[in-house]
A protein has these predicted regions:
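Membrane interfacial helix motifs at helix-loop boundaries and amphipathic/re-entrant anchors
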Residues: 1, 89-94
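Bacterial signal peptide processing site
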Residues: 79-82
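Short beta-strand edge/turn micro-motifs at domain boundaries
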Residues: 1-26, 84-85, 190-257, 317-325, ...
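Extracytoplasmic/luminal low-complexity segments enriched in Pro/Gly and acidic/polar residues
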Residues: 277-400
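C-terminal motif of bacterial Sec signal peptides marking the signal peptidase cleavage site
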Residues: 74-77
Length: 400
């Protein structure tokens, strides 16, 4: 369309130019004077047609002005249209939306709490698997087993559905074509003031499946929870192999475990904020005490810490850091140092799982830890912080 306007403008200019030529009239050559053969300079009085030329040029200006304005207007119209289209294309950003509404969130959490409570009451693993998976499932399965062996074993803490103090749903594109698992993090507060808040991490693996609980983590006192987006906006998930956070996420259990073994002397201690980490303080003290006690009875103990379930789940905070839920498996290997001696277990759960008081060959004890870390963005002055932790025993076996 702009090209047609340009052609029309050129045609109008052409006819305008022809009109000017007609108004100017014919060009005349001034004759020489008959008085002599010499050529003399022409003066203004010898140019009788100049007055008409000036008049003609005045008309030319009158003709050209509207034609030029029309041309500029037509071309300007073409240019404006093109500019608007370009701007519209440049500012077209992908529309984001959250995976669930507030009503859906309340229904999901309420149903989860009800179903898990029913499974806990009946100690029904099959029913539990309908709504719980991963590390949270493994810890509860062992608890059901222990409850079946002894009435002295207490059930695990109930899931608190309300009130929800933090809800962080995953963002997705409104134009999403390939379905991806949905993730949801939320914090609930118990009506019992003696019980701290708990963080739940849920995922929906496919459109036909329910949201399942992967992590149920007790938040530690004295740690400020990072600022996160409001529920209506949500946030993006953090890939386990991302390169913009301060550490590789799969290495968190190993590095933190090294700190549990070596304390402030660990080479990784400077990357973690340990000043308000009550979990670290209790575990480091407990491991040191066990090592000293076993040394007195001529036995050794070795503590190993590694990544448990490979499903590391992370979500971005407002400062571009990450809330990272990760599984850490602790393995304690105890061996007697003298022939004919044996090592014994003292905890109730360990005795029930071993079906014995000890072993002459040694013991292998495994625990599952569900941990929540705040990992700052790479290059930040902030340190990695442990925000929450929950632990449960998995197994006790005699060494062969």
């Amino acid at each position: 369309l702009g090209f047609l306007f340009l052609i029309a403008a050129l045609i109008m200019n052409y006819f305008g130019f022809r009109n000017v030529r007609k108004l100017r009239g014919p060009r005349r050559r001034i004759p020489r004077a008959p008085s002599g053969p010499k050529y003399r300079k022409r003066v203004k009085s010898d140019l009788p047609r100049r007055g008409r030329r000036v008049s003609g040029r005045g008309n030319a200006k009158y003709v050209f002005a509207p034609i030029s304005l029309i041309t500029i207007g037509l071309l300007g119209g073409c240019t404006t249209t093109q500019s608007v289209n370009t701007t519209e294309q440049a500012t077209k950003y992908p529309q984001l939306q959250v995976v669930i509404t507030d009503n859906q969130l309340q229904r999901i959490v309420g149903d989860l709490a009800t179903k898990v409570k029913a499974a806990d009451t009946a100690r029904d693993v099959i029913e539990l698997q309908q709504r719980v998976t991963g590390p949270a499932l493994e810890i509860r399965k062992v608890n059901y087993l222990l409850q079946g062996k002894s009435k002295k074993i207490k059930p695990l803490r109930d899931i608190v559905a309300n009130p929800i103090t933090v809800a962080l749903p995953m963002q997705i594109s409104a134009d999403e074509t390939d379905w991806q698992p949905r993730t949801l993090m939320l914090v609930t507060k118990s009506p019992n003031s003696k019980i701290g808040p708990q963080l739940m991490v849920l995922q929906q693996a496919s459109p036909r499946e329910n949201y399942k609980l992967w992590y149920l983590i007790d938040l530690l006192p004295g740690n400020a929870f990072p600022k996160v987006a409001v529920q209506d906006i949500g946030t993006l998930t953090v890939a386990a192999d991302n390169a913009f956070l301060a550490t590789k996420l799969s290495s968190l259990p190993y590095k933190y475990g090294n700190i549990l073994n070596n304390g402030a002397e660990s080479k990784y201690a400077r990357y973690f904020n340990l000043s308000s980490d009550g979990f670290y303080e209790a575990r480091f003290a407990d491991q040191s005490k066990q090592a000293k006690t076993l040394k007195k009875v001529k036995a050794t103990i070795k503590f190993l810490h590694k990544l448990g379930d490979p499903n590391i789940i992370g979500m971005l905070t407002l400062k571009s850091g990450g809330l990272i839920a990760v599984s850490m498996t602790d393995t304690s290997i105890i061996k007697p140092t003298t022939r004919g001696s044996a090592v014994s277990v003292t905890e109730k759960e360990q005795k029930l799982l071993l079906n014995s008081r000890g072993s002459s060959t040694g013991l292998k004890i495994k625990y599952e830890n569900m941990l929540l870390f705040y990992v700052p963005v790479s290059g930040s002055n902030e340190k990695i912080r442990l925000l929450g932790a929950s632990q449960g025993i998995l197994s006790v076996k005699a060494l062969k």
